[in-house]
Amino acid sequence: MAKTYKAKLMTDTKVRTGKVRLSYPHLFEKYDKSDKYQCQLIIDKDDRDTLSCIKKAIENAKADGKSSKWGGKIPGGLRNPLNDGDAMDEGGEVYENAYYINAKSNRKPQVVDLDRDDIFDPEEVYAGCYVRATIVFFPYDNSGAGVGVLLNNVQKLEEGERLGGGAASADEDFQDDEDDDLMG
């Protein structure tokens, strides 16, 4: 039986997700365009535990923003970090029946395996693998108002089909070389 990874609301605004799919990972080096470490987490709509924790943390961040940033009220047009994958025009099937969030950090996240040993090889943690992450939701009021997502740490749980048509390995490309006797 496959192990399940239960989501947890660790503080009012900090969530440890259940099993989610990793996309657009920039975990070992900062992404050039934003100068931040970042990734996208794709959450199955059937993962009620993770979604419940995330929604609660978002509400708590809104309450914090109402009192600390937004002058006692929640502004109209508030940006919500939880996005519906089914509403995307060009998301592909990976976003069907899923939500996604984008998480960023100025600090490099710790990336670990199932035994909580550090992972140093960026090839080991790729778009399409399954992870759980700790993320923190916070209110902001610069360039508009909304709730942002801070990326804390990532734990790789299992392999998954690479997203974006990742390159084949040299082993795969050259495995049948012995069978190709062109001079033959």
Model-derived segments and their meaning:
Residues 1-100:
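OB-fold ssDNA-binding interfaces and closely related basic DNA-contact patches used
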Residues 11, 83-88, 112, 170-180:
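Intrinsic disorder/low-complexity signal
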Residues 40-42, 102-104, 155-157:
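Residues in well-ordered beta-strands of folded domains
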Residues 64-143:
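Structured, beta-strand-rich domain cores
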Residues 18, 30, 49-51, 109-111, ...:
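Residues in flexible loops and secondary-structure boundaries
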Residues 38-40, 110, 155, 175:
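Residue-identity detector for glutamine
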Residues 117-184:
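Compact mixed alphabeta submodule
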